[in-house]
């Protein structure tokens, strides 16, 4: 994957009044004491992923950012100033007024989106003026996700609702996943018709089918993040861990 982020500037977002990150590398890890703003940096960058909420359930901003109302997005509640995240790939800005509510623009190198978010924090309007997807993708592991079929070759942010399709579409990924279960004398079964994943366990002459969501969270988490990495190229991937 080519490095496509070198410098990021964040302003007026949650606890961040103004912050510049420079000389970013291919892999960047934010480490620090609790409540110093590490997650807010990830959340600010995740605003680039708003267009992917169209393919997600629910289509709410809370899938990317922790908040209960619009004003929590703005530094010290100051909605007179716009939230702005600028980087090598473009600018994302969010604004608020009583008439329009929360709205914004995502101005990328080859794409432009107009964003409208209602008072329930649901993405209501998303106008794409070109035909490319954003290069920044936030992935947030959740259990009990209902999988669905998708033509997307990449894992759909933020929850990976097309996990089954992605594993099937990438032979090396599928091989890795099957090996993970083989180590525990288990087999993975893909039901394409119902878009479900089952785990097959053999005990003597008996066969048991175990729901995917019943296996250990650690194993589900590993498969989720492997799928995100295998299915993306030329993208910036954001992980909570």
Feature map (PLM): residue ranges:
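Walker B catalytic carboxylates
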Residues: 11, 240-241
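Phosphate-coordinating catalytic segments in nucleotide- and nucleic-acid-processing enzymes
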Residues: 2, 51-240
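Pre-Walker A-like glycine/lysine-rich segment at the N-terminus of P-loop NTPase domains
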Residues: 1-48
């Amino acid at each position: 994957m080519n490095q496509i982020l070198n410098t990021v500037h964040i302003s007026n977002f949650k606890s961040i009044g103004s912050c510049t990150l420079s000389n970013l590398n291919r892999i960047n890890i934010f480490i620090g004491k609790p409540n110093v703003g590490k997650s807010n940096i990830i959340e600010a960058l995740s605003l680039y992923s708003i267009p992917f909420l169209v393919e997600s359930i629910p289509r709410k901003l809370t899938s990317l950012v922790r908040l209960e109302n619009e004003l929590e997005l703005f530094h010290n509640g100051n909605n007179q100033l716009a939230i702005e995240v600028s980087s090598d790939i473009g600018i994302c800005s969010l604004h608020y007024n009583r008439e329009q509510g929360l709205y914004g623009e995502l101005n990328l190198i080859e794409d432009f989106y107009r964003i409208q978010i209602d008072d329930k924090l649901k993405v209501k309007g998303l106008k794409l003026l070109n035909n490319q997807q954003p290069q920044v993708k936030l992935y947030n592991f959740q259990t009990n996700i209902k999988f669905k079929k998708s033509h997307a070759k990449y894992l759909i942010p933020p929850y990976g609702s097309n996990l089954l399709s992605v594993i099937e579409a990438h032979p090396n990924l599928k091989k890795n996943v099957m090996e993970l279960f083989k180590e525990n004398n288990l087999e993975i079964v893909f039901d394409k018709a119902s878009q479900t994943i089952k785990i097959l366990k053999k005990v003597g002459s008996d066969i048991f089918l175990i729901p995917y969501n019943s296996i250990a969270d650690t194993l589900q988490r590993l498969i989720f993040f492997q799928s995100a990495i295998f299915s993306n190229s030329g993208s910036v991937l954001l992980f909570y861990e």
